[in-house]
């Protein structure tokens, strides 16, 4: 249990790029948070009232699927605290996964651009704007110890690993969620239970 799939499709209006998918093992804290919120939202059964029914904010979808049960809600924005918390968590996971894909590409094609990307990631980690960093830790670790990568990039990667390890230890000793709700960005996310 704990296998999670992150799937991203290109911008629906421009249809640029290819769909991407990655599987990773979500932390127990994240799994628990997602399923507690999903349960509070009745496993996404029924209709959800949104603050912006004309779609100016960008549509979001949440899906719960287990066996023959498949529930989905679509919304633009919501004042519901559980929806906000779940949206924020999925946004942070999405940002983390996108960084992983970008770092992999830069490592292969443009190692000199890694330093700027890693520095930006460091700022987001410090502000706790990423979630499930463990999913992309292997690529960051590979950068940190790859002698073909410029030293500045390797140093940023090592610092990033150290900071995320510190935050992981801090979260492990706390039962509180590691994020707080604030302004949300458009996204698409799927919550799916895996056995």
Model-predicted regions and their roles:
Residues 2-22, 119-123, 137-141:
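Acidic/histidine-rich, surface-exposed loop or edge segments in extracytoplasmic proteins
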Residues 24, 28, 80-83:
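Generic detection of long, well-ordered alpha-helical segments
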Residues 27-51:
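Charged, amphipathic alpha-helical segments
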Residues 20-25, 74:
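A short, exposed loop/beta-hairpin motif centered on an aromatic-Gly-Thr core
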Residues 47-195:
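Short, well-ordered, aromatic-rich surface patches in folded extracellular/luminal domains
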Residues 1-4, 67-69:
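Short, solvent-exposed coil/turn segments at beta-strand boundaries
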Residues 1, 29, 57-59:
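Extracytoplasmic
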Residues 25-33, 64-70:
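A short, structured loop/turn motif at beta-sheet edges
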């Amino acid at each position: 249990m704990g296998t999670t799939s992150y799937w991203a499709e290109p911008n629906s209006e421009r249809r640029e790029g290819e769909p991407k998918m990655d599987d990773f093992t979500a932390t127990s804290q994240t799994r628990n948070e997602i399923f507690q919120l999903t349960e509070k939202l009745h496993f996404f059964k029924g209709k959800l009232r949104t603050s912006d029914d004309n779609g100016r904010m960008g549509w979001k979808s949440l899906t719960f699927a287990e066996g023959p049960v498949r529930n989905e809600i679509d919304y633009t924005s919501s004042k519901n605290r559980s929806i906000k918390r779940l949206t924020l968590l999925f946004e942070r996971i999405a940002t983390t996964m996108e960084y992983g894909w970008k770092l992999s590409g830069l490592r292969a094609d443009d190692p000199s651009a890694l330093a700027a990307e890693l520095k930006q990631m460091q700022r987001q980690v410090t502000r706790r704007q990423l979630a499930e960093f463990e999913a992309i830790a292997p690529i960051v670790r590979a950068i940190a110890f790859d002698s073909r990568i410029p030293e500045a990039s390797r140093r940023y990667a090592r610092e990033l690993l150290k900071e995320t390890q510190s935050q992981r230890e801090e979260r492990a000793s706390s039962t509180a969620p590691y994020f707080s709700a604030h302004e949300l960005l458009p996204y698409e996310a799927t919550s799916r239970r895996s056995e």
